């Protein structure tokens, strides 16, 4: 195995370990803003996937997103009994949005931001952070609506009509904070890690 392939393997494994910890230890996977803003608890695992995709490229980013999806599916089936677990028991909902985060963010960075100056790249990284939050949220909502409708899901608390509006109402408040968090985190962390990775020969 070449030295460069070893570097990619080590960094990929490192990001997978981070995501495993974020899934297993809840306070590592979200920012608990509830003490400041009631009900706000933005998830940040999608930004780990986004940063991995920025550093390692779309293919490995999609793989790491798929790993998060696998953990999500496992968690949904191992701890049933809530609407959240019911949503992610559908493998399409668990996998597709997470894979798309890695794929789209990795492709976008390599195509439009890889060789840009610091200022432009900072703005672009912030945009990609917000986009990662949107891809994950919109994907989960749409696939949940499709899954619940096709399977005619009947569960306490799930309405029989206007399922899309109900789901949007649930996620929209948190989504605002996730987008803001993504803009800040991905821009800040990306600007630190991208130059380090590039000096080490890691260029997507």
From Swiss-Prot:
InterPro entries: ECF_trnsprt_substrate-spec. It comes from the Bacteria. Its main location: membrane. GO terms for molecular function: transmembrane transporter activity. Signal peptide: none annotated. It is a multi-pass membrane protein. In E.coli forms a stable energy-coupling factor (ECF) transporter complex probably composed of a membrane-embedded substrate-binding protein (S component), two ATP-binding proteins (A components) and a transmembrane protein (T component). This is Pantothenate transporter PanT. It comes from Leuconostoc mesenteroides subsp. mesenteroides (strain ATCC 8293 / DSM 20343 / BCRC 11652 / CCM 1803 / JCM 6124 / NCDO 523 / NBRC 100496 / NCIMB 8023 / NCTC 12954 / NRRL B-1118 / 37Y). The lineage of its organism: Bacteria, Bacillati, Bacillota, Bacilli, Lactobacillales. The gene is panT.
